[in-house]
Curated annotation (Swiss-Prot):
Catalytic-site annotation from UniProt: E861
Gene that encodes the chain: Adar
Protein's name according to its UniProt entry: Double-stranded RNA-specific adenosine deaminase
Assembly: Homodimer. Homodimerization is essential for its catalytic activity. Isoform 5 can form heterodimers with ADARB1/ADAR2. Isoform 1 and isoform 5 (via DRBM 3 domain) interact with TNPO1. Isoform 5 (via DRBM domains) interacts with XPO5. Isoform 1 and isoform 5 can interact with UPF1. Isoform 1 interacts with ILF2/NF45 and ILF3/NF90. Binding to ILF3/NF90 up-regulates ILF3-mediated gene expression. Isoform 1 and isoform 5 interact with EIF2AK2/PKR.
Induction: By inflammation. Under normal conditions, long forms starting at Met-1 are dominant. Inflammation causes selective induction of short forms starting at Met-519.
Amino acid sequence: MSQGFRGPTGVFPHQTQSYLDPSHEHSKWRYPQPQGPESYPRSFQLQQIEFLKGRLPEAPLIGIQTQSLPPFLPGHWPRFPGPPAQDRQLEIWEFPRSVTLRNQGFHIGPPLPPPHSRGTPWRGADGLCSHFRELSISQSPEQKVLNRLEELGEGKATTAHVLARELRIPKRDINRILYSLEKKGKLHRGRGKPPLWSLVPLSQAWTQPPGVVNPDSCIQEFPRGEPGLDSEDGDPASDLEGPSEPLDMAEIKEKICDYLFNVSNSSALNLAKNIGLTKARDVTSVLIDLERQGDVYRQGATPPIWYLTDKKRERLQMKRSTHSAPAPTPTAVPEATRSPSFPACHPPPAGASSSVAASKRVENGQEPAIKHESRHEARPGPMRLRPHAYHNGPSRAGYVASENGQWATDDIPDNLNSIHTAPGEFRAIMEMPSFYSPTLPRCSPYKKLTECQLKNPVSGLLEYAQFTSQTCDFNLIEQSGPSHEPRFKFQVVINGREFPPAEAGSKKVAKQDAAVKAMAILLREAKAKDSGQPEDLSHCPMEEDSEKPAEAQAPSSSATSLFSGKSPVTTLLECMHKLGNSCEFRLLSKEGPAHDPKFQYCVAVGAQTFPPVSAPSKKVAKQMAAEEAMKALQEEAASSADDQSGGANTDSLDESMAPNKIRRIGELVRYLNTNPVGGLLEYARSHGFAAEFKLIDQSGPPHEPKFVYQAKVGGRWFPAVCAHSKKQGKQDAADAALRVLIGESEKAEQLGFAEVTPVTGASLRRTMLLLSRSPDAHPKTLPLSGSTFHDQIAMLSHRCFNALTNSFQPSLLGRKILAAIIMKRDPEDMGVVVSLGTGNRCVKGDSLSLKGETVNDCHAEIISRRGFIRFLYSELMKYNHHTAKNSIFELARGGEKLQIKKTVSFHLYISTAPCGDGALFDKSCSDRAVESTESRHYPVFENPKQGKLRTKVENGEGTIPVESSDIVPTWDGIRLGERLRTMSCSDKILRWNVLGLQGALLTHFLQPVYLKSVTLGYLFSQGHLTRAICCRVTRDGKAFEDGLRYPFIVNHPKVGRVSVYDSKRQSGKTKETSVNWCMADGYDLEILDGTRGTVDGPGKELSRVSKKNIFLQFKKLCSFRARRDLLQLSYGEAKKAARDYDLAKNYFKKSLRDMGYGNWISKPQEEKNFYLCPVPND
């Protein structure tokens, strides 16, 4: 057995006495030491090693004249005896798991006797030494990996799989070790899959970014001739990755607190995304930990909103404002698993490079350093290295021993240790002026308020409060009103000072208004203080501010009170959008050089132009122009309110222009012609309501589910609807709610008409009478300024359809195309809808009827025209030459037929471009709505494909061109599967402009009836539309028109589009249902299945617009007019009997073929050969 331990400098005997009285001299316990300049420090370090290994009973001391080394753990460790060796023989090699940290020391193993007591020496050291040769220390997995990579040589790399096979360590452990060593800066990971791992080159030891501590750079390499220390001091538990998690946790906590300090509150998901994480669960545990520490608190349940506590916010505020040096590292670690932390190391000076070398091995007990806050703010000092706690090396001054034997100033860098500072330096640091001291330069409160005023009012006020180190709260004083129209009153409180409250329909707006009021008062006070006015004049009582909010605002903040945190341009556009008016920013002039331009802008709303303004940029000029327009509008609203209420002032422009008080023509058209969901949400928002959709029920198999949805607007539930998809269910529910809401609330007087009762299904007859029959029931023109002729046509169409569908049916819901024909008795007449229809489908080939019982084409334009024919039949049945004054007819030339009076005109409205040639253009060709008295057409002929005849797709949407060859559809061919061909709506409107709307049968009694105008709501291009509906046939001049016989002509109607809204493209297919109505039907709607051509329902009833029913009307009219020669004819023979019409139709088809547009495709002749029994004259 060896009698001593051979160290690097000599042989030391084993010490058997374990405890000594404190009164003994330290010199009695000095060991024999070799001679040399570094013998004493090396022997002292060896004594530390012997003590930590349990071979010495007492911690060694070092005099003040000598230098000490950093301890293994932070804190002041007192001198105390060690436990018996036999009790801790199994624990000494797992030191980190059994250590218990105290405030004044640490303890291993069983309880220790008090330092002042005496006891017999422990006799376990000899036993430990006697079995010392039998003990061995295995290398840690990290050390094995580093050794293996070192054996490969510098610049050589390998994969994790190879390392796992060679070292016989599981691959997942190898991966963990490799990434841990990479984080510590010891390994380099190359690109590729799998990555190649290699040692970090020695040249990169000092190239790490600032703030990153490389543990290797803090350790000196020992001579290769002394490998004993490396093997003796090995501790497998020291290289575990335990500290990495607390370090990440601390960094996440710091980021969370910093983010919550900048924003008042946030959800867990928002927090995670703003600090670099992805999911809420990544920060949930950290937030709960911070909540236990009293740093954050939460409100709400799903999901909770997190806030900083007031104490934590104050601490962060003080920390940010003082800019003081970072606090020293704590002297004790509260957790048993916490590893020591070392300050960042710096590269040595050039002169010391020869004595310092970076270690290539992972030393025992080495851990990454803790990241200190505000490390970059520490004043720079000389670059020096700190030796590792276990190994020999040159020490430095600054670690002195106190009288009680403690290791003083552990782990505190010299540049942060106030013990060694010069006299008075510590006091100078503590008495450093704060950030808000008047001696430091910073902007004035008035300047800061001016900057904050340009931001959102709430954000600006909070920023100003933070700037002045004040607390700012928004208190909810009162909440009133029903659930569908609540009112919230908020008040701003800054450091206990209360400001005037503000009330609005939402919490957000109320907070903004309250912030605007508080900001205006603070701005006025700060301005008065800067101008030198007495301070008592700048402060106004809260009562005066609350009673006179307009006087409390400075002139410079008047615009802010108008816009409630939004830009002037946005606010103006929103107001005009609510009012249904168009707003335009006009550039009047541009002056000045390129480096200093001047732009002059003005705002034009309808026919009204507001004062121009100039600014150095277009953006600023537009904002200033919008501000001038808003001020002018507010003055007009205030003056009108004074005239009506005797001088009562309105609080804001929004209230004076409340949409529930003033509604315009564009609102109805805009909401009914947009996407149903978007239209309902916009309608609800503009009226101050909240809208939502709720899934009531779900049933049916997975391949054919049924969803029942219900809309809720302003606390009111609307009828439920059923659909086969959730998207369609929401759209149908929105359509139903929108139709009911507008139908109930819309009144004629609110649209500028005389007093008319609300248009509902029950009062439709009276409404139509008031709008069409009574000359005194309505004004001659629409009084709305800015509305165009086409706007009036569109309004009448949608208003009539909305009134008819007030008591909705589920089959009416969803996206649809609307067409209507409006009649005007004279040019000054407002007009009345005489026929309307919806739909976008054609009949299937297997649903054709030989008896005329199906409607072949259910597109909206065709259905409205068939309804118009029924309206003409009803008017003809009422015609009497004695009462012809009230009729729309008059005798034509020759007296044999009737004709439409010259003052009566008919106008067609379609909510979108007609299918076929009229819709074949892209968005860039769309024209804006322009009110023009010129009716001249400018058709577009850009390529030979334009103008071609097209047919509709069977059981679908869209059109395809006809073939050039002759096509004769046959009944049996279609029944056997041949494609059914139906001409497009553009082609049929072209035929109406040549042959008339009345058709062949009515030509027996009437002269041709032509359209006066065509109005579109969407997809309007004047050149493409005019080419499609009339100008195709006159492309080569008047040759075609000259070939027509009297009374047929080529009619060129006036065309235009709606201007009060801009419809957006709606996705999804239209429904198969089709609605038809004419004035003769009262308020009775008929709903068809467009693919079957019959009434929608199980009975498949005959439609009133079918060939059979129209032919029945014709037979009644023949009997009434004593045209018995026509009663015995079939449907096809009666049409051919109209000789003039038949000749003109054949000429029209032949001309289209000759012009190269293609062949007109008709239905099989077999379906026109049905008869009806003669109808007796009633």
